[in-house]
Regions:
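Small-residue-enriched transmembrane helix starts and helix-helix packing motifs
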Residues: 291-307
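Membrane interface segments of multi-pass transport proteins and intramembrane proteases
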Residues: 47-51, 148-152, 325-341, 368
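Membrane-interacting alpha-helical segments
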Residues: 40, 65, 239-265, 277-280, ...
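Small-residue-rich helix-interface/hinge motifs
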Residues: 3-92, 311-330
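Juxtamembrane boundary at the C-terminal end of a transmembrane helix
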Residues: 356-370
Length: 370
């Protein structure tokens, strides 16, 4: 796969994910009557800009994402801050003249509206993921894969330890299975090649506490698991496509959350973190396999970004929501100085993690170990 195609594919993916996120903030801010000073596609010098209904719309030279500038996003608390803000406006940092502004500053909007603005970006990431998955499910060949067992191989260990043909797999190890991939994901996480299944059998839920699976070893001595059963296909109707896409969105969202939880709990090594270099490499590989693999990776990235942004961590949208909830409960905003200190510390930590992940990416590229 050429470097040019990899870069183009990466630009498309990153731009789509970031632009849709910022569009979410922009749309809800507009609906809530909050002043949006600028909505930009791309970064860097402006190639084109126009003020329309109180907002400057701009197209910038670097086709990487975009941003939304909201009036009052950093609310002043002191006379010094107010003076600095007046100085910025005097220098025309705000692209919209005062007489053309149509909304109120963000910090003057009700708390609930500010919360909606903060979560709207992540929400649109989930929407993008869902739309992409609808396209993928509709375009796939054959039927939709179900979670209902069609047949079990002769003498398969899973059949001897509880599973039967006709069982609909509801959960594995206590985690609900939204799609067939959930079953595989949980079994891969099961190091002992055995798991607790919940199935629906003859209309009743049945607990199977110790379903075991056959294993085999390759010539390198690596142990692999044999599933030992096949499942029914589901007819591809518009409703079933939408249901499968919705359940797949939940599946990807849970993968993102579990991955983060595993990292915090130490189950997943921090050395496995991927940074920008690793993500671009993965995008290039997906693009080389075809448009469907690229779209699937786009869905995974945008849903992961949505989950990550909602974490209650300063510098992320979820952290801002926590500050707003505190303000709503106590009636007093968290001091701007404290917010700023926590946000700077959080940015420093995230930047450090990104550098560490980028270092890991480069080492993997050099050594060929992915």
């Amino acid at each position: 796969m050429s470097i040019f195609i990899t870069l183009i594919a990466a630009l498309i993916v990153f731009s789509a994910v970031i632009a849709i996120h910022e569009f979410g903030h922009f749309t809800v801010a507009k609906l809530c009557g909050i002043q949006v000073n600028e909505f930009s596609i791309g970064m860097g010098p402006a190639l084109w800009k126009k003020i329309y209904k109180g907002t400057q719309y701009s197209l910038r030279a670097l086709p990487v994402g975009g941003y939304v500038a909201l009036e009052g996003e950093e609310s002043p608390e002191s006379q010094q801050a107010e003076a600095a803000r007046d100085e910025r406006e005097a220098e025309d940092e705000n692209p919209v003249p005062p007489e053309q502004r149509t909304g109120i500053p963000l910090n003057e909007a009700p708390v609930w509206q500010r919360v909606l603005v903060m979560v709207a970006g992540a929400f649109m990431n989930f929407v993008l993921g869902f739309v992409v998955l609808v396209i993928l499910v509709a375009a796939q060949e054959g039927a939709i894969t179900s979670k209902t067992i069609y047949s079990i191989e002769n003498d398969a260990l899973c059949g001897q330890t509880g599973l039967q043909a006709g069982d609909e797999i509801v959960a594995v190890n206590g985690r609900r299975c939204f799609v067939a991939n959930d079953i595989l994901y949980e079994l891969v996480r099961t190091e002992a090649y055995r798991a607790r299944f919940t199935v629906k059998r003859d209309g009743q839920k049945v607990e199977l506490p110790d379903v075991q699976f056959d294993t085999w070893q390759d010539e390198d001595g690596q142990t692999h698991m044999t599933l030992g059963f096949t499942v029914y296909g589901i007819k591809k109707t518009p409703l079933n496509v939408l249901k499968e896409a919705w359940n797949s969105t939940l599946y990807y969202g849970r993968i993102a959350f579990i991955s983060l939880a595993d990292l915090v709990r130490g189950r997943e090594s921090i050395n496995n973190l991927s940074g920008p270099v690793g993500i671009v490499t993965a995008i290039g590989q997906a693009a080389s396999y075809g448009w469907q693999d690229l779209l699937e990776l786009l869905a995974l990235i945008t849903i992961k970004l949505g989950v990550f942004n909602l974490l209650p961590f300063p510098a992320l949208d979820g952290g801002k929501v926590v500050f707003l909830i505190i303000e709503g409960v106590t009636g007093h905003a968290v001091p701007e100085k404290l917010q700023g200190t926590l946000t700077i510390a959080a940015f420093a930590l995230l930047f450090g993690l990104m550098l560490f992940a980028t270092y890991n990416d480069i080492i993997r590229l050099v050594t060929g170990v992915m």
